[in-house]
Amino acid sequence: MKGFVRNSRRGPAHSWWVALGLVVLLTACTVEESDGPVGSDDVVEPAPSGHGDWQVPGLVDRSGAPIEVPAPGPTTGRTLDVTDFGADPDPNSHDDAPAIRAALDAAKPGDEVVLPAGTYDLRSTDPADESANIVLRSGVNLRGEGQERTVLLTSLDGEDDSRVIRGSGVHDVIVADFTITSRHKGPLGDATGGPMYGIYLGANEGQASSRVLVKNLGIRRFERHGISVKASREVTLSGNYISEATAVGPGGQGYGIAIEGSADQHDPDATNDSRHNLVIGNTFDGRHLRHAILLQFPTHNNLVAENTIVGSLLDAIDLHGEGEYLNEIRDNTVIGGQQAGIALGNPGGSKNKHDASGRGNWVHSNDLIGNRQGVLVILGTPDTLIEDNWINAGEDSKAGIEVRNAPGTELHGNYITGGTDGFWAIRLSEDRGTDGRGTGIPSGIRIEYNVIRQAANGIRIDAGEDFSVVENVIDGAELRVADGIEVSHIR
């Protein structure tokens, strides 16, 4: 796997993360846009559809060779101004949705529809889809004049499956440079209201949406997902700012970004196989988000990178315990979450029961500051590689890395510091499962070359079998192994 050079921030830091979080929130709208497609240094074009599953995590083809995820090209045709079709950019004007839809209908592939600065009132839904204000078309871009200058204000308010913008089976589309919000005036996180989804991208008759770029959007006052990408591939979400969910209860409420496969489908040959999506350089105010970034169902070989999350009510980056596999989670900053910064496996679910995430996910080079756990792996999630993360515990932190029933997990080269009494840099414990699923003990765990400095406590092994604890540096802390547990190598 490709190596990573960490920055030089090392040593005790027990209180500065609060100030950093405030800075992040104040500067969130200045996130630098990605210069282009993101991949590994040496890239090849995606391999044609073949047979067999992937074996290597991240942005690779079936053979394991790095790929560059294709992105839609720039506008090559006309620019259509929605005000020429009757849209009024003044706030509290008439319904502007028909004019926007008319401009999209008039556009041809290669054209773009532009929303000049102003506020556009969306009071009606598409005649062919009563769930959506606006329906995207393949090859036609939709662009505002800036996240703070162009606003789409929807009147959708709690209707089932309601979406401000929907794209089903679309390709080669850019959606950029505006804010989506709603007229919801109630409390945040405690009620329901606004649209279910800000942006919804999905398949159409089994054909995935692909080559879609969603960038520099502000999305707030939604109920379920700010951006939802379902059964699609080659979708890039970059430079967006997401906050203020109106509900954060169970059943899928209050997710910032959700990348989903199809429930009960694990078929890499399917035309709607979920893979090769990028979630990069987005910012989340997690005070009213259940999860900031969520991967769900058998979605694989996605990249979640360089995102900043300040606070979240549950696990900030969550692989949701429904077979998500071979995803790469790197270079993210997660600050002050009430639960784990990054979690693999989930005990929830009503319609779809959650337990283990899939095999071979790669969690590396993240900065995890002041969360309850830095990384949590549970409920039978197998073969996770956790390496080169920088974890700084806060007063309420319980563990830097916590591993329960997670066979084959490797912890390598992580740097862990901070914490108060009761905090352990690395902790292995029995998994009691969820409704009888996922019970077990840690097994086949490798804890190697980690650095634990000025932490309240070092490594604690309460349960498990077949461990290797090798060449770790524990500064002023300790290694505690419960009676009756054998560790094959300790040095």
Residue ranges and their predicted role:
Residues 47-65, 69, 75, 82, ...:
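Acidic, glycine- and Ser/Thr-rich low-complexity intrinsically disordered tracts
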Residues 114, 121, 135, 141-143, ...:
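Extracellular beta-strand solenoid repeats
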Residues 100-109, 121-143, 151-176, 181-210, ...:
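Extracellular beta-strand-rich solenoid/capping regions of secreted or surface-exposed proteins
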Residues 26-28:
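C-terminal motif of bacterial Sec signal peptides marking the signal peptidase cleavage site
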